[in-house]
Swiss-Prot record:
Gene this protein is translated from: mesC
Superkingdom of origin organism: Bacteria
Name recorded for this polypeptide: Protein MesC
InterPro entries given in the database record: Thioredoxin-like_sf (IPR036249)
Provenance organism: Leuconostoc mesenteroides
UniProt keyword list: Plasmid
Amino acid sequence: MPDLNINEDLINNYQKLTNDIEIFHEISYIDFYNKMNNGKNSLIYLGKPTCPICVKFVPMLHDILAAKNMHIDYFNVDTFFENNSSDKINYINFFQTLNISQLPSLIFTHGDMNYQRLPIYTIKTPINAWITAINDK
């Protein structure tokens, strides 16, 4: 069982890494929805700075992507829930359609609402292999 303790240092490091625009590109719900429907390949990270597993996963993800000179779209789930949009029920229905119930999640989509998902992460090797495999497609 991973250590689920979270502290200010972990949160700050998470935010510093996800603010690295060479690696992470933060997207809105509308951007995320469009990427799932635009017919183009996209790699998307779903996480949030208040998730204990996310704050421990992001440094590993950052290192892998930096070594491969890749970038990733980042959907901050906390930002989504802070949004007071009148469309929130549509947003929630969209996420239920995707059946994403765990964070962090890595999603690779061809932009046709179909996707591959790598859910919970603890070991660097499988993550690295998965990212390499989708990058080679």
